[in-house]
């Protein structure tokens, strides 16, 4: 457990010691909130469903950007061999890196708290739906993070890791759409619903 915490601190600190982490947070919050605000003024209701409808597609792009450097950066900075010589299991290393990326993602998602705050000032939105939407987004983000860390471990280049993770996340996004589900249901009854 001590090894997991040390890797967690090291990697989480790396997100916030460079401006890249802050830029990522600002861009994600700006795009996600901006898309919601434009929809909100088109259909003025105290509802966050349009916000959560857009998030999976945004996560398909932003999560690979977070995970592409996780293992590739270790190889580039020649710290890969040093990490392997530490007295820790590979699972501890992976869990520490995953938790660091997940906490960074959760903090980024927490920065979007302005959206429900705005809704509560304008009306009476459903708190359960908002909490459920954020919880579902955290789970989807954790899944995409796991995919990104997996593919980053196989790729030596950050860009290749980004593209492979992006395409895989997008494939899973498409599988969840109504169009693909109805197509699967036509071919194999009951599987798409």
Question: For each of these PLM feature ranges, what is it?
Answer:
Residues 1-21:
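Aromatic- and glycine-rich beta-strand/loop motifs that create alpha-glucan
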Residues 10, 14, 73, 85, ...:
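Transmembrane helix-loop junction
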Residues 19-38, 54-63, 167-171:
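Hydrophobic alpha-helical transmembrane segments of multi-pass membrane transport/permease proteins
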Residues 35-37, 48, 58, 100-160, ...:
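Secretory targeting signals
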Residues 45, 164-193:
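Terminal transmembrane helical anchor/hairpin motif
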Residues 53-73, 108:
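Long, hydrophobic alpha-helical segments
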Residues 70-100:
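Helix-loop-helix units of permease transmembrane domains in multi-pass membrane transporters
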């Amino acid at each position: 457990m001590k090894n997991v915490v040390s890797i967690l601190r090291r990697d989480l600190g790396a997100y916030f010691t460079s401006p890249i982490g802050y830029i990522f947070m600002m861009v994600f919050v700006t795009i996600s909130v901006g898309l919601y605000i434009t929809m909100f003024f088109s259909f003025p209701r105290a509802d966050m469903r349009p916000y959560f409808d857009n998030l999976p597609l945004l996560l398909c792009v932003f999560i690979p950007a977070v995970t592409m450097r996780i293992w590739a950066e270790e190889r580039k900075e020649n710290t890969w061999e040093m990490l392997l010589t530490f007295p820790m299991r590979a699972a501890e290393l992976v869990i520490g890196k995953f938790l660091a990326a997940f906490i960074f993602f959760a903090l980024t998602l927490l920065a979007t708290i302005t959206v429900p705050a705005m809704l509560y000032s304008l009306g009476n939105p459903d708190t359960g739906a908002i909490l459920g939407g954020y919880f579902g987004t955290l789970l989807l983000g954790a899944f995409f993070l796991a995919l990104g860390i997996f593919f980053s471990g196989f790729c030596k280049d950050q860009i290749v890791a980004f593209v492979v993770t992006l395409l895989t996340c997008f494939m899973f996004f498409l599988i969840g759409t109504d169009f693909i589900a109805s197509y699967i249901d036509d071919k194999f009854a009951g599987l798409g619903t």
